Amino acid sequence: MGPAGATLEAFMINWMLSKLGWFEGNHLQDFTLHKNSGSGILTHGGSIANLTALSAARAAIAPEAWTKGSPKDLVVMGPSTAHYSIARAISIMGMGKNAFIPVPVDENEVLITSALESVYQEQLKKGKRVMAVVANACATSTGLFDNLDEVANFCEKHSLWYHVDGAHGAVALLSEKDKERVRGIERADSLIWDAHKMMRVSALCTAVLYKNYTSQVNTFQQKGSYVFHEGDVIGMDSMPFTVECTKSALGFKLYWSFALEGEKAISDFISNSFQQAKELYNYLSECSDFYCPYKPESNILCFQYQPEILTDEQQLDLRYQLIETGDFYITSCEVQGKRYLRTVLMNPLTQKKDFIALAEKIKTIATSIIKSAVK
């Protein structure tokens, strides 16, 4: 990556740590590992980031796992709606996907924190050790946030590693209007945070952040004379702490995004995107043919068109036909087994007239689908 790229990465990591209260340096160019300071690295996407963070959790509870393999009694608890990369990481680590223990969620797929204790006690009875507890900030499908403070209370009560998947929603830290959504995020032991989601950065660029720098140092225990050298090295070197050997100079594009627009502009973009989702919700809620199951907490909103008439397959067909028009692009997901249309608001030029046009286009396509079904 080179010395300049490594230094810029360390600078931006310090900036992100400072937003969590995990930075103990005198200024962002202070790269000294202070006793109570956090640490982190940038990596290529949330999947690798979750794998890295959970590897740190494993090193904390089972330091011998690096040489002897993952103990068979380790499990990870988290919402049943956790991103698929959590279960994938657990499998990659040799624990098997069944080592992910789902905690019940409510009708909007938000973690039921009151269920944590019973799930935990059940695992103890089975002779299991909980390696980590995962919380969503926010859920990929709905954009809704788990109660991070309540999960933190549970983890602190039982001295469990607390990991927050903040790939999409950790940016709420930068919005004065929305930072309440992530209250308690600073109590986590590890956090992943995508810059390529809502920080105006191209894919891929994800931070893995730790409250305590020793967590990062202990994650990977490996030697290789061609890249790792004994003793201190001159400058910054993130290689001992990442899955990747060679990686892009990720700190550059994150730095230049802020250098070009400034922190306030990025903050305003996030706040505006969250607000757009609320405005779309308000508009669709006034339309009798649309159903929105929840009020958005981020820039993601799920909705259905005439759910009492259109089947899940027809909702999906509606999306395909909408995309084929070339006028709009929306995604789709399942919430509690039901198919929804899903919007992610990220264009600062989006206005109410666009919401109206989207709704009208959906109505036109849906009418055609219904007529075809009758024939």
Where are these regions (language model features)?
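Conserved PLP-enzyme active-site core in the AAT-like
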Residues: 32-33, 48-217
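Short, glycine-/Ser/Thr-/acidic-enriched flexible segments
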Residues: 81-83, 107-108, 138-140, 169, ...
